[in-house]
Amino acid sequence: MQITDVRVRRVSKEGKMKAVVSITLDNEFVVHDIKVIEGEKGLFIAMPSRKAGDGEYRDIAHPINSITRDKIQSIILEKYELAALEGNIEEAE
């Protein structure tokens, strides 16, 4: 699996969420609404989720192993930091 495109959109409000990202896998499948969040230990990603009836949030799509999660997170954070440095982050709606 290759991440063939990463689109970064800045979140305009103040807070821990810094951006919303979409990734394309193998030029065939897109995952929207991956969040870049500032945590106590630095930036991390949160996969798209939905609030369940019990009030808990459940991921809609997510990697099934830590190697894939680390790969996706590394690429997204690299693209986010590069876009932030270059000023190439579009505003999220």
Curated annotation (Swiss-Prot):
Main function: Could be involved in septation.
Source organism of the structure: Lachnoclostridium phytofermentans (strain ATCC 700394 / DSM 18823 / ISDg) (Clostridium phytofermentans)
Name by which UniProt lists this protein: Putative septation protein SpoVG
Keywords: Cell cycle, Cell division, Septation
UniProt-listed GO biological process terms: division septum assembly; sporulation resulting in formation of a cellular spore
Family matches, as InterPro entries: SpoVG, SpoVG_sf
Protein family: Belongs to the SpoVG family.
Domain of life: Bacteria
Keyword Cell cycle (UniProt): yes
A Pfam family matched in the record: SpoVG
